[in-house]
Design a protein with these regions (language model features):
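Helicase motor interdomain insertion/brace
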Residues: 1-125, 140, 146-149, 162, ...
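SF2 helicase motor core recognition
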Residues: 156-171, 191-198
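A conserved SF2-helicase RecA2
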Residues: 152, 184-190, 194-238
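Secondary-structure transition/capping motifs at alpha-helix termini
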Residues: 112-117, 181, 196-201
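Amphipathic, heptad-repeat alpha-helical coiled-coil/stalk segments that mediate oligomerization
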Residues: 137-138, 142-143, 176-177, 183-190, ...
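Short, flexible/disordered intra-domain loops and linkers
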Residues: 128-138
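A short beta-strand element within the Helicase C-terminal
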Residues: 164-179, 188, 203-207
Length: 238
């Protein structure tokens, strides 16, 4: 669980480790932590009491992640592709499995490189909205979709849980901030923009993962599995 959150972003890993320290043993709180997972095998009922040694490890993990929060390499790569490679001009959707990661990325971009650029956050549980100049204003998801279609929004950051059935052919590029362990979900992310009505002949996709991490190995396995699935069935439907 913690490795998966850390594989998404440093902030998601830090927040999860801190919540685990504070809430372990609180079944309701732990179910909230697990709510965004795409792996049904991870269940709160399987969690035993935390040992003193494990608590110490979590405390060290939180401290280490805190020390590195301002230097997340994924952020630098996202900025490079949006700005230097001009993906923002083509329209871009960024997917993350976790709201913590989506909100963090939108806020950092809005405070720094993308000041005065409206950034959409597309999520569930009434957490969708617009980030502008570092400030967040809640908006309905239908409003965000219309803003993308009209060209008012060039950048949308969405979570998997909220994005089923999302059709955004106006956007021409996709960044996977993290990688779901279910290969079908990874393919369906691309399907949000690679649809009838897409004006670009090719859709550019960037998959981000930390080198040497568990996510790096997952990417290798997903690539192999997706290739096998495409060979058998073609593009995966929604």
């Amino acid at each position: 669980l913690l490795l998966r959150r850390m594989g998404s972003s440093i902030i998601a890993g830090r927040n999860t480790a801190q919540k685990m320290l504070n809430e372990w043993g609180n079944d309701e709180a732990m179910e909230g932590i697990l709510g965004e997972e795409d792996d049904d095998s991870i269940e709160s009922s399987s969690m035993r009491d935390i040992t003193p040694a494990e608590r110490t490890e979590l405390e060290l993990t939180v401290a280490a992640l805190n020390d590195n929060m301002s230097a997340d390499p994924k952020y630098k790569i996202v900025v490079e592709y949006l700005m230097q490679k001009k993906w923002l001009e083509l329209g871009c959707i960024i997917f993350s499995q976790y709201y913590d990661s989506a909100y963090w990325l939108a806020e950092e971009l809005s405070k720094n490189e993308l000041k005065s650029e409206a950034i959409g956050i597309y999520a569930g549980n009434n957490r969708s909205g617009i980030m502008l100049d570092g400030y967040f204003q809640r908006k309905e998801r239908d409003t965000l979709k219309q803003m993308v279609r009209s060209g008012e929004l060039r950048l949308l950051i969405g979570t998997d849980a909220a994005s089923e059935g999302l059709n955004l052919q106006r956007l021409g590029t996709l960044i996977n901030l993290d990688l779901p362990w279910n290969p079908t979900k990874l393919e369906q992310r691309k399907g949000r923009i690679q649809r009838i009505g897409q004006t670009r002949e090719t859709v550019d996709v960037l998959n981000l993962r930390y080198r040497g991490s568990v996510e790096d190995r997952v990417h290798q396995l997903l690539s192999s599995r997706l290739e096998s699935i495409r060979d058998m069935f073609g593009q995966i439907p929604d």
